[in-house]
């Protein structure tokens, strides 16, 4: 797969995620961007800084009480959306992470993650902030922080989604 994507050299990504491996809340993004690829950690660029602000508002922290991972584990060329084949190649890694972490809630950041984990026809613009139970896990999709940087008009909706997440955490009596 790396050869197909012009990635003949070893991956720069050193980590498949970051955070508390015993977290009850798992955030899943699409894949690493340029900064993430260089630093080997998800959400470290401007989108990551925005995500950290939303987390802080509701009392969450990537260092303490959540885990962050991605659908794909290496950066697609030209920062394009990961192709289905790339997603399928990496999804077992995410499933293994989910089995190890055992989250109660998975927050899908953006369309790619939501369509891969919640429903193929998930529409972030219509279904963001909704909780959907699959097995023993509650899923919620919301806007990807990078999309918010491109379209700040969705920031209030995203804040509301995060506040709904905070309320769900309290309802489920999840210790944070």
Regions found by a protein language model. Give the residues of each.
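A polyanion-binding, active-site-adjacent surface
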Residues: 1-176
């Amino acid at each position: 797969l790396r050869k197909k994507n012009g990635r003949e050299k070893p991956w720069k990504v050193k980590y498949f995620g970051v955070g508390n491996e015993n977290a009850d809340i798992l955030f899943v993004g699409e894949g690493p961007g340029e900064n993430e690829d260089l630093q080997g950690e998800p959400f470290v660029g401007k989108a990551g800084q925005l995500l950290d602000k939303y987390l802080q508002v509701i009392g969450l922290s990537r260092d303490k009480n959540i885990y962050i991972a991605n659908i794909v584990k290496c950066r697609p060329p030209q920062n394009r959306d990961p192709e289905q084949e790339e997603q399928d190649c990496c999804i077992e890694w995410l499933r293994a992470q989910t089995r190890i972490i055992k989250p109660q809630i998975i927050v899908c950041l953006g369309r790619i993650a939501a369509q891969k984990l919640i429903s193929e026809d998930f529409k972030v613009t219509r279904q963001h902030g909704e909780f959907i139970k699959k097995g023993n896990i509650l899923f919620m999709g919301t806007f990807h922080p990078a999309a918010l940087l491109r379209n700040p008009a969705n920031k209030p909706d995203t804040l509301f989604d995060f506040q709904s997440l905070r309320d769900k955490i309290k309802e489920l009596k999840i210790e944070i």
